């Protein structure tokens, strides 16, 4: 039997979403360039989604998109658009309009199921360019994570080693997930889409043992020891 020419499969990709709050193209370009300079391994030439929910009706999509593209980023879609005129301009430019998913609300009255939480265990170093994804489970890494490496988990992430890469917990939208690390020096830390770049982590906790979680939807950090 001959193999079909194509095959559709589900997959997971890490995409940064840029929430634009200022319609001035030059301000947007400068702000993005500053972010890229701080985390070049994560953002340089990266694919991004532009969220335009914070923009007014008179926004020029052509000027805005050119400002983003001038930084070297690649726009792969646009979200948060409710203005019909802006939608038309985006569609004419050949980009898709995306709907950002939300984590399902948990029923307060529902009795939690007594099921064991799965855990993926990695005992070897995670090197630059590698991506580890723990689908529907927690992730434990007992070795170092190099810059340019990426850890993704739908659950919690534990790193018992030097963390220099990127860690994204609660990837499916669970805001109750946490990140635990014994030596925290990451390029990026994210929980349920809320993230910090390296320069946003308090200097007093860089290289130290720390726990990160969400409090009222805001990323927070606490010393472990």
UniProtKB/Swiss-Prot annotation:
Key words, A-Z: Cell cycle, Cell division, Septation
GO biological process, one term: regulation of cell septum assembly
UniProt keyword Cell cycle present: yes
Coiled-coil residue spans: none
Domain of life: Bacteria
InterPro entries for this protein: CAP/MinC_C, MinC, MinC_C_sf, MinC_N, Septum_form_inhib_MinC_C
Xref: PANTHER family: SEPTUM SITE-DETERMINING PROTEIN MINC
Family: Belongs to the MinC family.
Described function: Cell division inhibitor that blocks the formation of polar Z ring septums. Rapidly oscillates between the poles of the cell to destabilize FtsZ filaments that have formed before they mature into polar Z rings. Prevents FtsZ polymerization.
HAMAP family, alphabetized: MinC
Subunit structure: Interacts with MinD and FtsZ.
Name assigned to this protein: Probable septum site-determining protein MinC
UniProt organism field: Sodalis glossinidius (strain morsitans)
Source taxonomy: Bacteria, Pseudomonadati, Pseudomonadota, Gammaproteobacteria, Enterobacterales
Gene: minC
């Amino acid at each position: 039997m001959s193999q079909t020419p194509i095959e559709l499969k589900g997959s997971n990709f890490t995409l940064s979403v840029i929430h634009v709050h200022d319609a001035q193209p030059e301000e947007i370009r400068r702000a993005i360039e500053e972010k890229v300079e701080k985390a070049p391994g994560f953002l340089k030439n990266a694919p991004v989604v532009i969220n335009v929910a914070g923009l007014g009706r008179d926004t020029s999509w052509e000027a805005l998109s050119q400002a983003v593209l001038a930084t070297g980023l690649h726009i792969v879609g646009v979200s948060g658009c409710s203005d019909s005129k802006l939608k038309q301009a985006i569609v004419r430019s050949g980009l898709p309009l995306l709907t950002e998913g939300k984590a399902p609300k948990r029923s307060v009255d529902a009795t939690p199921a007594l099921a064991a939480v799965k855990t993926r265990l990695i005992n070897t170093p995670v090197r630059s360019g590698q991506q580890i994804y723990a689908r529907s489970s927690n992730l434990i890494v007992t070795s170092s994570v190099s810059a340019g490496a990426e850890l993704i988990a739908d659950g919690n992430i534990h790193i018992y080693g030097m963390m220099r890469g990127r860690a994204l917990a609660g990837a499916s939208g669970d805001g109750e997930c946490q990140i635990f690390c014994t030596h925290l020096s990451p390029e990026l830390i994210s929980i349920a889409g809320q993230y910090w770049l390296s320069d946003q982590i308090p200097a007093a906790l860089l290289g130290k043992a720390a726990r990160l979680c969400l409090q009222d939807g805001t990323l927070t950090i606490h010393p472990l020891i």
